[in-house]
């Protein structure tokens, strides 16, 4: 089962390692992890995407609440939410492949942010599925040389606020 946890925690040294320690102690892999300060520089928001057994994930979520640095934990998948990921991808193409890269970048609403005679660097934001679909659309027409992805970030929709 895929889970996305949003964790509001104090922006302090060691807070990240304590949260991540809960996952590593149980042998759970983190699919993606993003952490950054919020509009309040004393707080950070951590978004963790993981896949696993529901019982163990519930246990981890309960133990996250007990950590001193953690102020709030919310599972984004439990309600209406918005999630996004940013990807930078370096693509090698020539001839027809270059036209296909430009066309697919436009279709997926990405931006070409760097161009050389043999490479394009494309920036794309969206759901993980959208980014995966973009990569799949290029596999037959160009060579994907390098990929960097930010990991998922998300917020609840509507009036629900994490403070």
Swiss-Prot record:
One of its GO terms (molecular function) is acetolactate synthase regulator activity. Keywords: Amino-acid biosynthesis, Branched-chain amino acid biosynthesis, Transferase. It comes from the Bacteria. GO terms for biological process: isoleucine biosynthetic process; L-valine biosynthetic process. The keyword Transferase applies. It catalyses: 2 pyruvate + H(+) = (2S)-2-acetolactate + CO2. The keyword Kinase does not apply. Residues 4-78 form the ACT domain. Pathway: Amino-acid biosynthesis; L-isoleucine biosynthesis; L-isoleucine from 2-oxobutanoate: step 1/4; Amino-acid biosynthesis; L-valine biosynthesis; L-valine from pyruvate: step 1/4. It is an enzyme of class 2 (transferase). Sensitive to valine inhibition. Transmembrane segments: none annotated. Coiled coil: none annotated. It holds the Pfam family ALS_ss_C. Its EC number is 2.2.1.6. One of its GO terms (cellular component) is cytosol. Dimer of large and small chains. S.typhimurium contains genes for 3 AHAS isozymes: ilvBN, ilvGM and ilvIH. Belongs to the acetolactate synthase small subunit family. This is Acetolactate synthase isozyme 3 small subunit. It comes from Salmonella typhimurium (strain LT2 / SGSC1412 / ATCC 700720). The lineage of its organism: Bacteria, Pseudomonadati, Pseudomonadota, Gammaproteobacteria, Enterobacterales.
């Amino acid at each position: 089962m895929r889970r996305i946890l949003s964790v509001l925690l104090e922006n302090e040294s060691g807070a990240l390692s304590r949260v991540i320690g809960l996952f590593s102690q149980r042998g759970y892999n983190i699919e993606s992890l993003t952490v950054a300060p919020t509009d309040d520089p004393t707080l950070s928001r951590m978004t963790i995407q993981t896949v696993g057994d529901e019982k163990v994930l519930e246990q981890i979520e309960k133990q996250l609440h007990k950590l001193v640095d953690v102020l709030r934990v919310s599972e984004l998948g439990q309600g209406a939410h918005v999630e996004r990921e940013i990807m930078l991808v370096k693509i090698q193409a020539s001839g027809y492949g270059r036209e296909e890269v430009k066309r697919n970048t436009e279709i997926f609403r990405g931006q070409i942010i760097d161009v050389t005679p043999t490479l394009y660097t494309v920036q794309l934001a969206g759901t993980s599925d959208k980014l995966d679909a973009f990569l799949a659309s290029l596999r037959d027409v160009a060579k994907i040389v390098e990929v960097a992805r930010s990991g998922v970030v998300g917020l609840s929709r509507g009036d629900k606020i994490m403070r």
